[in-house]
Regions:
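Conserved acetyl-CoA-binding loop-helix of GNAT-fold acetyltransferases
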Residues: 81-94
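C-terminal "cap" of GNAT-fold acetyltransferases
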Residues: 109, 129-207
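A conserved beta-strand-loop-helix scaffold within acyl/acetyltransferase catalytic domains
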Residues: 28-50, 55-67, 71-74
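Conserved active-site alpha-helix within GNAT-family acetyltransferase domains
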Residues: 98-101, 109-133
């Protein structure tokens, strides 16, 4: 079961979490949400099992633009490798679909590409941190998202963003970003891994 989580509850989970990479990641996400005062406007969603928080999604939902902007997915330290990130993703997109959201966008780090490919994402550009930008219509399930992606390989107009978004994404090329040599190599390898789901060449069709 997933539900929105208040700031104090997440702070308590952080206080009780052992030191580790996931705890640092969750702390950074918590700080970001606090800094932008998003706990009031867009509270995170948390997956619970046996009344224990397992994973958390930080995202904004815009009724005006009909966009879901997903910032981070965090698994609580010690709960890795149990499928909690996939569970919260599936439940979260279903909730957003029921809220009449129409598109979802996010930036995917090179290290997360393998996991995100299982979510049915397509990719268009590279941000300043070397992450791959993803933006597509929101479907209710991962399977429907993957079905749409397969169709988009032959009909890219099915997933193209608006003209304004396409113009912005065209400017975000790997070659133009201020990345270190190591970052550039990691991002290049991620693009190769994405393969046919790297749809950058079709952005001009949206102009």
């Amino acid at each position: 079961m997933i539900k929105t989580v208040e700031e104090y509850a997440l702070k308590k989970t952080l206080a009780n979490s052992p030191n580790g990479r996931n705890t640092k990641f969750l702390q950074a996400s918590f700080s970001l949400w606090t800094r932008f005062k998003n706990f009031q406007k867009n509270p995170p969603y948390a997956l619970y099992e046996d009344d224990e928080m397992k994973s958390i999604i930080f995202a904004t939902i815009s009724k005006k633009s009909k966009y879901v902007n997903l910032y981070e997915i965090c698994t609580v330290q010690g709960q890795e490798g149990k499928g909690y990130a996939s569970k919260i993703w599936s439940e979260f997109i279903a909730i957003c679909f029921e809220k009449k959201m129409e598109r979802i966008k996010l930036s995917c780090t090179p290290s997360s590409i393998t996991w995100h490919l299982r979510n049915g994402l397509v990719f268009w550009a590279v941000d300043r941190q070397g992450s791959l930008r993803s933006d597509q219509p929101l479907m209710k399930t991962r399977e429907e998202q993957k079905e749409l992606r397969e169709k988009a390989i032959y009909e890219p107009q099915l997933v193209l963003p608006s003209k304004k978004v396409c113009e912005k994404l065209i400017q975000e090329a790997l070659e133009t970003q201020p990345l270190s040599q190591k970052q550039s190599i990691n991002t290049y390898n991620a693009i190769q891994q994405v393969g046919k789901y790297w749809l950058r060449n079709y952005l001009k069709n949206g102009l």
